[in-house]
Amino acid sequence: KGFTVTLLTRVSKHKNLIESLGIQVLDWPFTRGGGNIFGGVRSIVYIMRAIKHSNSNIIYAVAIKPIIFSSLAATLSGVKNKIFTLGGVGFIFSSNRVLARMIRPVLIKVLRLALKGHKTRLILQNKDDREMFLGYKIIENERIILIRGSGVDTDKFFPRKLRKNLTTIILPARMLWDKGVREFVSCAQQLKEDGVTARFCLVGGVDIQNPESVSVAQLKKWTDQKVVEWWGNQNNMSEIYSRSTIICFPSYREGLPKSLLEAASSGLPIVAYDVPGCREIVIDGVNGFLIPFKDDNSLRDAILKLVKDQDLCHSMGFLGREMVLKNFSQKIISEQTLSVF
């Protein structure tokens, strides 16, 4: 499209692959969790050096901390064109913990400053997040762009033939309490006690930098008790979905979860809470079930209904796939995102 792109990131094993696409990669020793004022200042300096090195005239950043650091660095470097994406509002906005409630007012003020400027635009992934940002007066409506998700590769994630053996129900997410891990395990325990024969599998790694992280010890305890299986972090999720029957995703709040887009593209029915982000993907009774927040009985009943009815699983999975092809494919979302630049 005529852009020269420089990526500032914590360099990993993917550097060569990214550079093979014609993108220059610069190392940024950035950590998401914790941190202090000195780490923040160092990050801003790194970004300013990258701006000078690449002679950038547009800054694009994703997630709260990179947005804050990049915005200040861009302002100090004289760059006015800033485009930011928030895939979700994170722990500070979604949690009711004391720490989150204490930090939230400060973060709101910082975000107001970071998102100032008529050439600064913010991409959000669902209407609920947009209404929240408008309610807090963080940014004006005309500078918010709603793009639903980051897109899914529908050629990679496609429906497979449903296996007629043991039903496999998975929660594909980082192992965080606010992703609904506790509720998933409780549901598994209740259904097994009721005589339901199925595999309940947690698919995702721990995130020690997140205050909501579930401990490895707790995950191993559940596994030892044969309540659930923990498969850990998986690189080939298309293969995981091909071995799955139902997605159970009782997350408390999302931006627009890529895992659910991939699952829907793979032709799987989804059971999720009726919360921001999830309700953008799941239409109740069409491609899955939306459950009132923290309603354990309804969550269990919805899973049981799907376990007992393979035809319903298939029809809901088919409609989910059609929804993704129409609204959420990588091509559609990429075109919408490029139009912002």
Name what the model sees in each region.
Residues 8-13, 172, 199-214:
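Glycosyltransferase donor-sugar binding loop
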Residues 26-29, 105-159, 168-171:
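Donor nucleotide-sugar binding/catalytic pocket of nucleotide-sugar-dependent glycosyltransferases
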Residues 61-67, 86:
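Short His-centered aromatic/hydrophobic patch
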Residues 176-190, 297:
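A conserved mid-protein helix/loop that constitutes part of the nucleotide-sugar donor-binding site
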Residues 233, 252:
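Aromatic "clamp/platform" in nucleotide-sugar-dependent glycosyltransferases that forms part
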Residues 269-272, 282:
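Short hydrophobic beta-strand element within catalytic cores of glycosyltransferases
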Residues 284-285, 289-296, 305-310:
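Conserved acidic donor-binding segment of nucleotide-sugar-dependent glycosyltransferases
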Residues 298, 305, 312-327, 333-339:
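A short, well-ordered alpha-helix in the C-terminal region of glycosyltransferases
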